[in-house]
């Protein structure tokens, strides 16, 4: 068993527009408070579920006051809160109340048993990297964003292919005609990048992956770069090209705009139950080894 820091103030975050989430959040809050922890709620979550009796805080206030944030929702909720809390190094615990649950790894049915043990110090910790990106137009930055999973440059559904000029560390890599290009973290390698035939990167691998989306030339393949690489993607052709960050914020691009992407100085601590295995997550979520030869193999 790995014993870590015991927490005092716990922030609860939920996907506020999800039907049926109020009861499990209230139940978890009561369970945690009964064990002597101070419980606060993220403000939008508190408003949506009517969490009377608990302080309601903005993400910035959570970062300044809470020792840990427990997120009940899907991967998107976890990504959004991770980006907002990244500057504060607030650890995150993810409870899956969505569909896939790659990064919300605790089943909701187990939360009342597992979460209190983790808050008492029984957990495994890992750091997840983020990307920071900026859009440069006519030599001036016009937009900045963080991305937990990926930065995606792509065409709209009704326009032709995008033409992109890609450079790494100031050196020309290639011109590419495609539906777009994904720049992904190891965490994001199991998201959109995976569906575009990109490789899976272990979360502790120091890398950034570039994955073309439906490239015109079959020789345009994914490539893994060192995570200190500085990537520049210039729009040199195409109509209605845009860029999105974790599929949660979007910006329209113009000809000759450049998207500059690099690893963020921020990392986000993820906390897992003792015995957590990334390989078990892959096996379960991607349906690997559906007919294991033994129970021992299945539990590894």
Curated annotation (Swiss-Prot):
It is found in: Cytoplasm. Involved in the regulation of the intracellular balance of NAD and NADP, and is a key enzyme in the biosynthesis of NADP. Catalyzes specifically the phosphorylation on 2'-hydroxyl of the adenosine moiety of NAD to yield NADP. It comes from the Bacteria. It comes from Burkholderia pseudomallei (strain K96243). PANTHER family: NAD KINASE. One of its GO terms (biological process) is NADP biosynthetic process. It catalyses: NAD(+) + ATP = ADP + NADP(+) + H(+). NAD(+) binds at residues 75-76, 149-150, 177, 179, 190-195, 214, 248. The gene is nadK. Its EC number is 2.7.1.23. This is NAD kinase. Its cofactor is a divalent metal cation.
């Amino acid at each position: 068993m790995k014993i870590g820091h015991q927490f005092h103030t716990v922030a609860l975050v939920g996907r506020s527009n999800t039907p049926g989430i109020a009861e499990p959040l209230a139940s978890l809050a009561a369970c945690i408070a009964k064990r002597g922890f101070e419980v606060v709620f993220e403000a939008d979550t508190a408003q949506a579920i009517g969490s009377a009796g608990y302080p309601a805080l903005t993400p910035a206030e959570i970062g300044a006051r809470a020792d840990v944030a427990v997120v009940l929702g899907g991967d998107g909720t976890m990504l959004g809160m991770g980006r907002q809390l990244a500057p504060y190094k607030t650890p995150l615990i993810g409870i899956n109340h969505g569909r896939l649950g790659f990064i919300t790894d605790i089943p909701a049915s187990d939360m009342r048993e597992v979460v209190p043990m983790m808050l008492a110090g029984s957990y495994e910790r890992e750091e997840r990297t983020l990307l920071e990106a900026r859009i440069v137009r006519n030599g001036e930055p016009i937009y900045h964003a963080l991305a937990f999973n990926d930065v995606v440059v792509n065409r709209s559904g009704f326009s032709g292919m995008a033409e992109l000029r890609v450079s790494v560390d100031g050196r020309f890599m290639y011109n590419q005609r495609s539906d777009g290009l994904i720049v992904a973290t190891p965490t994001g390698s199991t998201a959109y990048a995976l569906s575009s035939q990109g490789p899976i990167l272990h979360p502790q691998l120091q890398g950034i992956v570039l994955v073309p989306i439906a490239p015109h030339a079959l020789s345009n393949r994914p490539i893994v770069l060192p995570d200190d690489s500085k990537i520049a993607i210039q729009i040199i052709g195409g109509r209605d090209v845009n860029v999105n960050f974790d599929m949660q914020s979007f910006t329209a691009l113009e000809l000759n705009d450049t998207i500059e992407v690099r690893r963020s100085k921020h990392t986000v601590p993820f906390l897992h139950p003792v015995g957590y295995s990334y390989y078990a997550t892959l096996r379960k979520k991607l349906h690997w080894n559906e007919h294991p030869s033994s129970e021992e193999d299945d539990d590894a």
